[in-house]
Amino acid sequence: MPGQKIRIRLRAYDHRLLDESAKKIVEVAKQTNAKVSGPIPLPTERSLYVVLRSPLKHKDSREQFEKKVHKRLIDIIEPNSKTIDALMKINLPAGVDVEINL
């Protein structure tokens, strides 16, 4: 498939799981002789939620919760059919969201 590029976006709450998954994908792509660019770390999405601790009074007492979504980007340049087959067979952890664009 000359001239094609596969763009893989990974998202997870745990950055260690994300880095392990990215490493697996890069290793598989390199084993099938495809050119790999990445993993490129993208900005982390950070959401902050503030909740009152008491349902009735004590407005000054609040609890803060934070959610971070870590992201990585991997480009596989000039993939072949072996690369695509190998990528389909990879087992990734349940906490990692994978989005693939051709």
From Swiss-Prot:
Q: Which gene encodes it?
A: rpsJ
Assembly and binders = Part of the 30S ribosomal subunit.
Q: What does this protein do?
A: Involved in the binding of tRNA to the ribosomes.
Molecular function as annotated in GO:
structural constituent of ribosome; tRNA binding
Q: Pfam families of this UniProt entry?
A: Ribosomal_S10
InterPro entries, per the entry = Ribosomal_uS10, Ribosomal_uS10_CS, Ribosomal_uS10_dom, Ribosomal_uS10_dom_sf
Q: Which GO terms describe its biological process?
A: translation
Q: Which UniProt keywords apply?
A: Ribonucleoprotein, Ribosomal protein
Q: Which GO terms describe its cellular component?
A: ribonucleoprotein complex; ribosome
Q: Which PROSITE patterns match?
A: RIBOSOMAL_S10
The protein here is known as Small ribosomal subunit protein uS10
- Member of which family? Belongs to the universal ribosomal protein uS10 family.
**Keyword Ubl conjugation assigned:** no
